[in-house]
Each structure stands twice: as structure tokens, then as C-alpha cells.
Amino acid sequence: MRQFALSLALILTSGWASAFEAEDVARFGPPDSDRELRIISTADIAFFKPMISSFLASESGTAIEYTVVSSSELQKAIVDEDEAFDVVISSAMDLQTKLANDGWAQSFTSEATGGLPDWAVWNDMLFAFTQEPAAIVVSKSGFGDIPLPESRNDLINLLRQHPEVFRGRVGTYDVRQSGLGYLFATQDTRASEIYWRLTEVMGGLDAQLYCCSSDMIDAVKSGDLLIAYNVLGSYAINREDRDEFAIILPSDFTTVMLRTALIPSNAPSSELAALFMDHLMTLSHGTDAQPLTHPALDLSQNEASLNRIRIGPGLLVFLDQLKKRAFLSEWESAILQK
């Protein structure tokens, strides 16, 4: 009996250990509601709260459970653990495309989704509701009289001219851990070879590596970093302390991520999920659109320099295991320089 109990404990412990890890969980709406929408998302609660609040205002009696995870943990929850969520939201467009392509999303059409621009929908399964640029975030006070960079070439020259100032104080994504960071990095290499030169220069100055945009911005605020590269501009511009930062959209090209949503194939409340998707698309693309990003990040003025990442099977190229291993090996050589 004791042996059986020990074996059972090991099995249960093993199951707990393999469960996906949530960074944050919040509940909105009536605490005792039996009409609940479960959302799993890579977006911070503060970033997405306005959309949740506006939906609940139109759907009284509904509750929303909002779970924040990393992009890799999102994949684990949906694919490995078959968790029952109603809506899946992520900034990692390639991983979202893979979910839809591999049969983890259900088809959905409505009046709201029928009028979307071509770049905002793929196969009636994956829907984009924001356009968010990758930005260079700089500490205004930390730069002093040093001129701000306007392009990647400017940034390279700046780092080479002032190594004593920037050593250990430049940050970017750890693309081994961050799905969005990996997406941005691979798209940068498609746009220009300058990415590898910049990565080598940052690596030579002991670049600090981070999981997510919010941590990089916090590090710039605290003074641990002076520069954060490929940060989500939407996260920086929506902060109350945004005046402390210079948010630079590189003039050579600005990579633009589309945050996407899908309804998973096993959604327990698919009808409620459809209502939420309608709301999301209407607010994002309708005649009275209310973008989640700040108007100061209006991209229409920079259309010529935009490198807008397109949803579709082209995003799956760098998810091929051989290509991914080769990319990460080259990235580690450039950024770690061991």
C-alpha cells in the first residue's frame, strides 16, 4: 500500500511539474457567473484591460478569466496539455499560424470579420487586431548630450563610439526563450543583413538578455539599461511614465507585429468566444475603431519604411527545427561571443 501511495505521489508530482506556467491570472465580471469566457494571452493585463472592460459593458452577467503566459507556455497549454480556453491571443504570429495550420483553431466568420483588410485575416481562423512596431527604447536622462540614433546604422556607430558608456547597458530579447523575440529577429534578418552586425556589436558590449518587453522597459527606467532594442513600442508608449523614454521607430525599416487572436478547436464556450471576436474586430477595424495602441504610434506616416509581418505559411519557415537550430547557433555566437 505504501509503495502504491508513493507511486501515485510521483505520478501526480510529475503531472504538476509539467503543467504550463502562468505569469498572471485575473478575473473580471461577476464572481458567481455561470457564463464565463476563458482567455489565454501573452499580453499584459494592463494592456488588454480596456478591451475586456468594453466587452463586459455590452455583455452583462458575463465573466472573463484572463491568463497571461509566455508564448512558449501558451503553446504548451494548447498543444501539449489540451487546455480548454475559448480565445487564444498572442504576439508570436509564427506560433499562432502554426496552431491554426496544425488544426488547433476553428473557422469563424461574421459580419465583423468579413470586412477585414487582407493582412488582418488568414483562412478565417487567425485574426489580427493591432499593428505594433518594434522600437528602440532609450533613456532620455541616461543619454545626456549623446545624440539619439534614428536607424540601426546610427545605433551601431553610437555603440562603437561610446563603448564605455553602453557596456552592459544594452538590452534585447533572449530569442531562445521569447517567441516574439525570435519572430522579430528572424524578420529583421529577412529585411536586412544589418541585424547580424548590430547583434555582434551588442554582444561585444555584454548585452543583457530579457524575456519580454515590459522587463526591458523597466530596466531602462531603473537605469540598468540605457538602450533596449526591438521592444514593443505599444508597451512603452502606453506607460504613464512614457515621457522618460525616447521611443524610436528605426528609419531604415520598422518591423511591425500583428497581434492575433483565434478560437481554439476545443473552446468550451465557442459562441461566447465568437461574440468576443466580433467585439474585438469591430473595435479594431470598424468605422469607430479604438486602437489599443497610443495615437503617437500612428504608423500611417511611415508606411514606406514599414516591414509589416504578414500572416501565413511563410512564417513557418523559421519554425523548422533544423533552420531554428542553425539560426539560434548563429545568434548565440553573435550575442554571447564565448
Give the residues covered by each predicted segment.
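Early extracytoplasmic/lumenal segment of secretory-pathway proteins
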Residues: 19-98
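A local structural motif
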Residues: 34-37, 58-68, 84, 166-169, ...
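Extracytoplasmic ligand-binding site segments that recognize negatively charged/polar headgroups
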Residues: 42-43, 91-221
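Paired acidic/hydrophobic, glycine-rich loop segments that form the ligand-binding mouth/hinge
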Residues: 85-90, 209, 226-231, 246-247
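A ligand-binding cleft/hinge motif common to bilobed small-molecule-binding domains
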Residues: 94-98, 221-244
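Short beta-strand->loop
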Residues: 105-114, 125-128, 243-255, 265-266
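A bilobed periplasmic-binding-protein/Venus flytrap-type ligand-binding module shared by bacterial periplasmic
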Residues: 135-142, 185, 257-272, 288-291
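Mature extracytoplasmic/periplasmic domains
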Residues: 264-321
